[in-house]
Structures are given as structure tokens and as C-alpha cells.
Amino acid sequence: MILYHGTDIDSALDILNHGLDAAKLTALQLERPTQLGPGWYAAYEPEVAWFFASLAPGNVGRGYTVIAIDIPDDVLNQLVAARQAIRNAIVNVPFGAQQYWFDLRAFEVLNTHTTFRPYAGQEPSHG
């Protein structure tokens, strides 16, 4: 399955080069609202990821982007069964969309069994 994560440029480069880092993510999410608590969020559609990338705290003056995550179905199913991944509707946004939330405990599995890559698509026009 391909999922999409929107973030600022520096965070995207860090994920692409080093994988997910629970300590860094925890520091970034400190005192920031999250729908399901601390963890990593990935959307089904790249357009949704672009929306959240534009809201990333590190994007001001630096830019933002979307990365694609290729996660094998069996790995995703294993994480769901272990309650380390939850699929749910995104709330408090002006559109309907689905996402996966990944618990910090899932990062080792994600870093080992998934492929993170730059998303080649362009940000959708809002005009």
C-alpha cells in the first residue's frame, strides 16, 4: 500500500535519509494537538498530505513537501493487529479523508520494512 505524509523540507529529508525517529517526532509534537496522540500520520491521498504539509510548523520560510511510503500489506496488517497502526477518518478538516496513525512503537518495523521516497507529484492548485 502507498500512503503519503506531508511535512516540512527538513523533516522530509531526515525521514528519507535516516527513517522515522521517535525522539525527534515527540519533541515536534510536544504541546501540539494530535488527533490520536503522539505518533506518525499518513494519508491515503497525496492531496491530503499536501494540505497537512502546508501546516507543518517547520515550513515557514523553508517550504514543505510530501513523501510516499510503500508499506507491504502484511506489515501493515501486523501493525494493525498489534494496535500500533489505526485507520481512521481525519476530523476537523474541511474535507473527508482517511489516514493511518502509527504508534511510536511501530517505527522500528516501519524503518525496516517500508520504503520512504520523495513523492513526484505536484501540489494541487487551489485557484
Pin down the residues of each PLM region.
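Histidine-centered active-site/metal-ligand motif
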Residues: 5
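Conserved NAD+-utilizing ADP-ribose enzyme module
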Residues: 1-2, 10-11, 32-38, 47-127
